[in-house]
Amino acid sequence: MKIISYNVNGIRAAITKGFTTWLQEENPDILCIQELKAEVEQVDLSEIFALGYEVYWHSAQKKGYSGVAIFSKIRPNNVSVGCGIDKYDAEGRVLRADYDGFSVMSVYMPSGSSGDERQAFKMDWLGDFQNYINALKIEFPNLVIAGDYNICHKAIDIHNPKGNANSSGFLPEEREWMEGFVSRGFVDSFRAVNEEAHHYSWWSYRAGARGKNLGWRIDYQMVSEPLASKIQHASILPEVKHSDHCPIVLLLNS
């Protein structure tokens, strides 16, 4: 079972940069997408359907902003849109597909980098999302929570930890939340198989950061502990360049 998560930073722009050809070549069973920046009616999905994918979409109310999707070659038993909290669901941040024996979520966590108001919103989200997952995990114990978390967990996950110590995405309280999230029954699938430094999933467009690999690892596929023994492989694909993020891959034994 191959699951990929990818913040495409605008699905329409990504398609013009060869996204569909890449998808055909990579051929995941399930693709979780974040930051669609489009309504489903605005995107020609005919080539996606032709590749054998069913498409599930949750866009934000605000045009050209946020939004998550799941493209799946396996028909889910159920698809759940949102997390049931209006202020987050209006921003298109959570989508879940339930399959036989496991569930996959595509999640786009808020960024706080634009200022204090959005940072406060992000901190509210983190607490509320944790409570939501605590309850969800009782009903759906086999969870893959894939997406853009907008947080680097540890110093190894960011190119300049000292210089970014006061930056949103690497604040002590955000990292503490991530530590708590993992301690409540989740495994960072990439770190389960790779403990090396200099593996990142997002790079600023400024100052040639990507070419110099001055990045942040803010995209994760978190796997609930009952599924952890099924992790076969996990990787990051920095050579794939339709976005300021790159895709992250998880292979699970069926």
What are these regions (language model features)?
Residues 63-78, 197, 209-229:
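Conserved beta strand-loop-helix elements of the APE1-like EEP
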Residues 84-85, 110-126, 162-166:
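Surface-exposed cleft-lining segments at the edges of enzyme active sites
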